[in-house]
């Protein structure tokens, strides 16, 4: 496992970045829009009525921000997507792939990897890259709906369902990938126990 320390460090940094976005950046934006959560934090997104309320909250805050000369929630939301949330998805994707790989990596006691475990590893990679696509496209759609320029127009209601599907897809693929990683590590622990000879009686 010593050879894998850069990967574990990357995982720690990824978790730290997620915690910072979820506990610092997102609440700061929510505070400006009456406590409503940004779409990224809702596993099933907003329905049409919820999206209308969120749009109105962003628009109201934008007017207040322009009058007060401060950054609006909408601008902060776009900045989040252009900054931290631009870096996080690829980091999380790499971390998922690494955790799956680490479960199969045993150079000190090489064992044949069963086909089922190899398939599980492949599925983790497929889910991780699907998550990556969903997250990036979700951010782009959300920006086009709640960005400062969009707030001067009517809400694009056709995008509401699209955003919900992308958000649900993001959460579903990441949860399934994590579940498969747990299964791979359980397989690893069971394999190690079976390969360890019983202690000789004294």
Where are these regions (language model features)?
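N-terminal signal-anchor transmembrane alpha helix
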Residues: 2-38
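Membrane-interface amphipathic/juxtamembrane segments adjacent to transmembrane helices
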Residues: 32-58
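Individual transmembrane alpha-helix segments
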Residues: 56-92
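Membrane-interface loop-to-helix entry segments
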Residues: 79-94, 164-176
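Cytoplasmic juxtamembrane regions at transmembrane-helix boundaries
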Residues: 94-120, 189-202
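Alpha-helical transmembrane segments of multi-pass membrane proteins
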Residues: 127-134
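Interfacial helix-loop-helix junctions of multi-pass membrane proteins
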Residues: 139-160
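Primarily interfacial, aromatic-capped hydrophobic alpha-helices that serve as membrane anchors
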Residues: 158-201
């Amino acid at each position: 496992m010593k050879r894998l320390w850069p990967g574990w460090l990357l995982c720690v940094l990824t978790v730290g970045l997620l915690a910072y976005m979820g506990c610092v950046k997102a609440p700061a934006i929510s505070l400006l829009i009456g406590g409503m959560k940004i779409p990224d934090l809702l596993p099933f997104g907003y329905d049409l009525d919820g999206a209308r309320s969120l749009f109105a909250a962003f628009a109201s805050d934008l007017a207040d921000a322009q009058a007060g000369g401060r950054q609006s929630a909408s601008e902060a939301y776009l900045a989040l997507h252009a900054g931290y949330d631009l870096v996080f998805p690829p980091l999380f994707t790499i971390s998922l792939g690494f955790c799956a790989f680490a479960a199969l990596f045993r150079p000190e006691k090489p064992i044949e990897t069963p086909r089922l475990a190899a398939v599980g590893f492949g599925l983790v990679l497929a889910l991780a890259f699907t998550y990556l696509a969903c997250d990036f496209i979700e951010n782009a759609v959300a920006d086009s709906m709640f960005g400062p320029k969009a707030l001067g127009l009517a809400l694009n209601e056709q995008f509401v369902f699209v955003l919900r599907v992308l958000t649900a897809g993001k959460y579903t693929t990441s949860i399934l990938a994590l579940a498969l990683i747990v299964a791979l590590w359980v397989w690893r622990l069971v394999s190690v126990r079976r390969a360890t000879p019983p202690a000789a009686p004294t």
